[in-house]
Amino acid sequence: MKIAVLSRNPRLYSTRRLVEAGEQRGHEVVVIDTLRAYMNIASHKPQIHYRGKPLEGFDAVIPRIGASVTFYGCAVLRQFEMQGVFPLNESVAIARSRDKLRALQLLSRRGVGLPVTGFAHSPDDIPDLIRMVNGAPLVIKVLEGTQGIGVVLCETEKAAESVIEAFMGLKQDIMVQEYIKEAGGADIRCFVVGDKVIAAMKRQAKPGEFRSNLHRGGSASLIKITPEERMTAIRAAKVMGLNVAGVDILRSNHGPLVMEVNSSPGLAGIEETTGKDVAGLIIQYLEKNGGPHLTRTKGKG
């Protein structure tokens, strides 16, 4: 197969591993800088150009699209889909999961367990919003944030009111979530490929911190997940329409709660912690399931 990897940086661990795994299995793998690919949209034959030449002959595309380039990255991926190239994750599914609010609404509609979450526009509604999520302590999240940036834990209702007001004053869209104390600053990252959880790790926040992101100094360890957690992760990825996803789950007193479904999960933490060849399993998934013109939405999304 000829596989394109959409990535801003060929030196990133995840990108390097996908190239290695693809080449080891006899495929040609080309890394394409997402922002340097440009499109001829209004032609009978949809084209993508890169450094002055059309990109042609690809069988599959692996999108590693950073949150900051979601809009442009999805447009490039859609163009590949219109050419009949098989995407590891579809543009529609990526856009869906990147909109945190929409993602939670879809998960909620399908009965997937979530922390109680509130969303409001007017400062007048702040007191009721806080009551809605069972009061303080509570977590405030900026909708555009990644890697734990723009996430605040408010210990008191007074602090919560001040922080929510400040964000609203800055015209920042935020959501307010109940704080799951019993999770103890830990979450579980389930790595879903197809309809299986192929690897899982526990991420523990460093002392004095509540965000367990590895980018924020959290530590990772092996964990055995329960059948219910496994089912929840697989369902969450399915609701989003993602073939490959990192599903972040909290252990609460009333079962597993999904915090986020990540469409471009990093491979470094999960491979180092579990010792599994996650990149190889992703390439195997493409070999089994890839093929021309198999995009469910046919790039119309």
Curated annotation (Swiss-Prot):
| Xref: InterPro entries | ATP-grasp (IPR011761), ATP-grasp_RimK-type (IPR013651), ATP_grasp_subdomain_1 (IPR013815), RimK (IPR023533), Rimk_N (IPR041107), Rp_bS6_RimK/Lys_biosynth_LsyX (IPR004666)
Supply the EC number(s).
6.3.2.-
Entry note: cofactor: Binds 2 magnesium or manganese ions per subunit.
So where does ATP get bound? Answer: 141, 178-179, 187, 211-213
| Any single GO BP term | translation
Q: Which residues bind Mg(2+) 2?
A: 260, 262
- Is the Kinase keyword given for this protein? no
Residues reported in the UniProt entry to bind Mn(2+) 1: 248, 260
Query: What Gene3D superfamilies does the record point to?
Result: 3.40.50.20, ATP-grasp fold, A domain, ATP-grasp fold, B domain
> Per UniProt, where does Mn(2+) 2 bind?
260, 262
Would I find Nucleotidyltransferase among this entry's keywords? no
Q: Where is the ATP-grasp domain?
A: 104-287
* Keywords, comma-separated and alphabetical: ATP-binding, Ligase, Magnesium, Manganese, Metal-binding, Nucleotide-binding, Protein biosynthesis
A GO term for molecular function: metal ion binding
One cellular component term (GO) for this entry is:
cytoplasm
UniProt lists the family membership as follows: Belongs to the RimK family.
Q: What NCBIfam families does the annotation carry? A: PRK10446.1, rimK_fam
Name of this protein: Probable alpha-L-glutamate ligase
Report the source organism.
Answer: Stutzerimonas stutzeri (strain A1501) (Pseudomonas stutzeri)
